[in-house]
């Protein structure tokens, strides 16, 4: 599919028109079912890399800042960011900058109370770790690693995997997966962050391994007093996302779009022709801060996809970035 700004900005256009009616900003509820349009693959891995994956994205000073994991041609993992760009159509020409130290499966956000940027990740010195910076565009300008979570889980081949961090007015929350059909949560007072969530966590969702696999993300839904969780699942037709909602970050989560035939995002509703898989990514947020706020009038999902005909070692599969835009 040819990438055009017109296609990518269609929801923003509609939102702007609605906002003009009555002179107030439009507010939208989350849809009861989802239908998307998709770009094609937006970037190719640079020489020596086989895959670009596990994306986290913020918009800062009008530009996208994207971090992700890479797999090299031997299947070894590393980390990278893209040089800042204003429009998704510019991602292909943005620089791909290797990080000197791995921050695999990252989460990037600005922690407003302390005026500091946070990059949380796995496979560091502790179960989950984080680094800080004053400049999120500099791939190698991050601090030394600090402990984010030091606990372990049982009944998991991978151990803790794929964290995300989000805050409300009083607390910060850590959510993560285990490739084992469970989603976990830990919390701390917001005044103690950045810091270590400790060793304890609780299981908040439990299902089959296939239904709750990995890549959990949690967001504040703008204007709705609601939170949205998406979790990657394994289906007959590839990876897809299921969604859940809650009234509070410490509350109960209720499935919203939970089947492969009617997912949050997957082959059944993505509109993508270049990939069957809609895998590990990040919704585009309203602002870069710890609230992880998304606009339900203008949902876009940065995801990883791959050629359906590619096979072999998972770590060598040719994952690339694409973007879904919700049809409204």
UniProtKB/Swiss-Prot annotation:
Subcellular locations according to the entry: Secreted
A Pfam family matched in the record: Glyco_hydro_62
This enzyme's EC code(s): 3.2.1.55
A GO molecular-function descriptor: alpha-L-arabinofuranosidase activity
Transmembrane segments: none
UniProt enzyme class: hydrolase
Keyword flag Coiled coil: no
Cellular component GO terms held in the UniProt record: extracellular region
Keyword terms of this UniProt record: Carbohydrate metabolism, Glycoprotein, Glycosidase, Hydrolase, Polysaccharide degradation, Secreted, Signal, Xylan degradation
Extent of the signal sequence: 1-26
Family matches, as CDD domains: GH62 (cd08987)
Domain of life: Eukaryota
Glycosylation sites: 309
Reactions this protein catalyses: Hydrolysis of terminal non-reducing alpha-L-arabinofuranoside residues in alpha-L-arabinosides
Biological process (GO), any one: L-arabinose metabolic process
Cited function: Alpha-L-arabinofuranosidase involved in the hydrolysis of xylan, a major structural heterogeneous polysaccharide found in plant biomass representing the second most abundant polysaccharide in the biosphere, after cellulose. Releases L-arabinose from arabinoxylan.
Similarity-based family: Belongs to the glycosyl hydrolase 62 family.
Name of the protein this chain belongs to: Alpha-L-arabinofuranosidase axhA
Source organism of the structure: Aspergillus sojae
Name of encoding gene: axhA
């Amino acid at each position: 599919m040819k990438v055009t700004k017109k296609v990518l900005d269609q929801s923003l256009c509609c939102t702007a028109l609605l906002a003009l009616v009555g002179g107030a900003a439009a507010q939208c509820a989350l849809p009861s079912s989802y239908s998307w349009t998709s770009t094609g693959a937006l970037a190719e891995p640079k020489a020596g890399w086989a895959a670009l994956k596990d994306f986290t994205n913020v918009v800062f000073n009008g530009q996208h800042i994207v971090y992700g994991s890479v797999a090299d041609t031997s299947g070894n993992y590393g980390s990278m960011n893209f040089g800042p760009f204003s429009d998704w159509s510019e991602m292909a020409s943005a620089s791909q900058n290797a990080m000197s130290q791995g921050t695999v499966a990252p989460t990037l956000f600005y922690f407003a109370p302390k005026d500091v940027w946070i990059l949380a990740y796995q496979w560091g010195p502790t179960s989950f770790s984080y680094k800080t910076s004053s400049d999120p565009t500099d791939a190698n300008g991050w601090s030394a690693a600090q402990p984010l979570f030091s606990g372990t889980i049982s009944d998991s081949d991978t151990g803790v995997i794929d964290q995300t961090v989000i805050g409300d007015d009083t607390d910060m929350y850590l959510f993560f997966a285990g490739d084992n059909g469970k989603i976990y949560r830990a919390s701390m007072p917001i005044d103690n962050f950045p810091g270590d969530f400790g060793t304890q966590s609780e299981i908040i969702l439990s299902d089959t391994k296939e239904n709750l696999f990995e890549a959990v993300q949690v967001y504040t839904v703008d204007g709705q007093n609601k939170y949205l969780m998406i979790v990657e699942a394994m289906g007959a037709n590839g990876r897809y996302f299921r969604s859940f909602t809650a009234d509070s970050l410490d509350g109960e989560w209720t499935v919203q779009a939970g089947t492969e035939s009617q997912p949050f995002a997957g082959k059944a509703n993505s509109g993508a022709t270049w990939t069957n898989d809609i895998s590990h990514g990040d919704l585009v947020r309203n602002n870069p801060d710890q609230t992880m706020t998304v606009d339900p009038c203008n949902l876009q999902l940065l995801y990883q996809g791959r050629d359906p005909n590619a096979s072999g070692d998972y770590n060598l599969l040719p994952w690339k970035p694409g973007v879904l835009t919700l049809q409204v």
